[in-house]
């Protein structure tokens, strides 16, 4: 399953939040890819970088953050851990690690 299918799966009922997520994640992906492309000597996996950037905030759907149209029950600080659980359930453990570790020290 690609990142678009995963976002569509979890965000089908909240178009406003989906738009916010896609705009933010696209900006993160552009920045991450720009940085990665400046270092061809590292042989980075650009496809993985794009996918991970697009999915890093997937867990916000389960949080309570009405200012950004999130109406779940969990504290926002947990969105990385929640997203990691979602991505592991989708068979994406490598992406899950990025998700759970992008918020501070990964202790959310």
What are these regions (language model features)?
Residues 4-8, 29, 33, 84, ...:
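An amphipathic alpha-helix signature
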Residues 1-12, 78, 85, 91:
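Short N-terminal secondary-structure initiator segments
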Residues 27-34, 38-40, 47:
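A positional/architectural concept
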Residues 41-108:
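Divalent metal-dependent catalytic cores for phosphoryl transfer on phosphate-bearing substrates
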Residues 2-24, 61-72:
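Active-site flanking loop/helix segments enriched in acidic
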Residues 15-18, 39-43:
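Residues at alpha-helix boundaries and short interhelical turns
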């Amino acid at each position: 399953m690609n990142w678009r299918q995963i976002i569509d799966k979890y965000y089908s009922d909240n178009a406003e939040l989906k738009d916010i997520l896609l705009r933010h994640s696209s900006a993160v992906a552009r920045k991450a890819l720009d940085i990665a492309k400046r270092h061809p000597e590292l042989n980075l996996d650009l496809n993985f970088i794009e996918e991970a950037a697009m999915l890093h905030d997937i867990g916000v759907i389960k949080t309570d953050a009405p200012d950004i149209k999130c109406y779940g029950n969990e504290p926002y600080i947990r969105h990385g851990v929640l997203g990691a659980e979602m991505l592991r359930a989708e068979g994406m453990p490598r992406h899950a690690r990025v998700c759970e570790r992008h918020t501070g020290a990964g202790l959310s």
